[in-house]
Design a protein with these regions (language model features):
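Classic N-terminal secretory signal peptides
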Residues: 1-21
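Post-signal/leader-peptide non-cytosolic segments of secretory proteins
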Residues: 22-99
Length: 101
């Protein structure tokens, strides 16, 4: 019975783990945890949970996608594009478009 409960819990956690850090698509981590479950940037839907928002869309320039996310979420502390983290200088450029608090 205990094994069944653990298996069920692990199965339920899988979608959240996959959403946390997509290998394809984009992931944005704002300085302040998102207060919305979903958001749209232009025509890109994002899902937010925990400390980040993710989308599986791969179209568009990574810098543009980062700037659009920052415009909605505020200053980002991390951004990944197709599994690759933005270097500090790219993140700083992205955050020039961050919404004011």
């Amino acid at each position: 019975m205990k094994t069944l409960a653990l298996l069920a819990a692990a199965t339920l956690a899988l979608p959240f783990a996959a959403a946390a850090q997509p290998a394809r698509g984009y992931s944005a981590v704002p300085a302040t945890a998102p207060t919305v479950a979903t958001m749209m940037t232009r025509s890109t839907p994002w899902k937010c949970a925990g400390d980040r928002c993710v989308t599986n869309r791969t179209e568009g320039s990574p810098l543009t996608m980062c700037q659009l996310a920052a415009k909605e979420l505020g200053t980002l502390t991390a951004f990944t594009a197709n599994g690759a983290a933005f270097p500090d200088e790219q993140l700083a450029k992205c955050n020039t478009r961050a919404k004011s608090a």
